[in-house]
Amino acid sequence: LRVLSDPSEEVILCDLRLLTQICSRADEHHFRLFLTDLLERFAADRRLLESWGSLIIRQLCVHLQTERVFPVLADILETYEDLEFASIMVQNLNMILVASQELKPLRRRIRALDTREHQQLFVRLYRCWSHNAISALCLCLLTQSYEHAYNVLRIFADLDVSLSMLLQVDKLVQLIESPIFTSLRLQLLEPEQHPFLVKCLYGMLMLLPQSSAFATLRNRLQAVHGLGHLTMPNDERPHTRYARQATPDVPWNELLQHFRTVQLRHERLRLATERLTDNEPRRRVQQREPAPFARMSFTANAGTRSARE
């Protein structure tokens, strides 16, 4: 694994081929140990994660099957003790899942949710994705779980929405405008059939400050609003259900509670970190300046010595 830190892409690719050959013959226990060690290396070397993390994960998916790699990574990260790293890693995995060509088959499977296996895969990813609120929201939009996405968005009202979260919402708006979410944009043509999708996008609009992403999303929703004046004959109206909340085999309420619990843990960590950061300058000032009592004692002792003299 140390070779993965080599600056040469060719060396990294050769090393990955060797690692994948070893892992292809390993049982699930040793495969999990390998991915755990890989995550620990990413946690210790953030530069490696930023520079080569996406390439390494995508190559593992190509050679070891995405359906094997991603669920195990999700299981490990779900209970990861370093919450900050877990959130960063989930954000990276989400971008790989959404945008990488290598993960197109996995996207098809979790979009379908038509078999128990696909539903269990979604649940495993979602429980891990809860470490990063915007990634969890993106996963819901990707799987067309619009009612759940709206419920997730409502939980944001109880959270401290940080600048980092707003920047991630900005990126999510850009993703919605990309080819990956073409089906989502086309579903906006049927707002009566996908009311929670419309409400979710309006909720994102309310989160965003006045910015280019705000203008992009507002323009998209204004175009949808104009459809409200159109009507269709009853016999031509599509008879579709309100997307994913009607899938009974997925424990939606349990997942929502899990998301809330994990996000509250992250919020407590952020608040504790902010308090430490705020107190650090005060400690430095106190270390530089003598305490008032010490100055008084010094003055008093000096006065006593003068009187004796």
Q: Where on the chain are the PLM-derived regions?
A:
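Eukaryotic scaffolding regions of large macromolecular assemblies
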Residues: 8, 19-22, 27, 32-309
